[in-house]
Amino acid sequence: MILSLNERPQEAVAVIDASGTVLKYGELLAFSEKIGALLPQRSLLFLLTENNVGGIAWSIGSINSGNVPLILNAHIEEGLFHNLFEIYRPPYVCVPSSMADTLQYESVYEYYGYTLLCTGMEPCRVHDDLSHLLPTSGSTGSPKLVRHKYENIEAAALNISTFFGLTSSDRPLLVLPLYYTMGLSVVFSHLYVGATILITHQSMTDKAFWS
């Protein structure tokens, strides 16, 4: 269990996105258990995210269930995606449901606007300490990845929340992508204290951002 999520008030709101979709802490925990039941333990999956409730739910749920997501930009260039796919050959890919038909894989499960697909690739062994993977350069598709450990998640969340004095009453606005280390750090540190994250895909130059 990462970030002591089971100790948060289960009816408290964990995330609200720009569409008004709400995710509670209890729902996040239940979703983690669902992913754990769907996937073989320690499965590698490519997780193509957007800044919305589904992106956070699948990211946290995958990690919390003991699986290992490589978190990527949902709009990564096709050639770069296939390059990563050929190198790492993930047994599962999770994408926004609007993109699922573009990949010719078997649909396993759909929730929070994302669809989990089975690629048919053979499972590979991943290190027991590995929690998730991130690209080294945002959405460029570099085959080099940053490896993160479970203990790093906890330590960073504790350090950041302590340094900034974060509390459950905070309402951070997340505009950084989830496939950026700093973007995920905002998520981890605020979930650690039971805060409510406001996440948006909109740019600060968009009129809708300020409405």
Residue map of PLM features:
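Hydrophobic alpha-helical segments in the ANL/AMP-binding
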Residues: 3-4, 53-72, 82, 160-162, ...
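Conserved AMP-binding A3 loop
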Residues: 22-25, 130-158
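ATP-dependent adenylate-forming carboxylate-activation enzymes
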Residues: 49, 70-85, 195-211
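Conserved AMP-binding/adenylation subdomain of ANL enzymes
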Residues: 154-171, 181-211
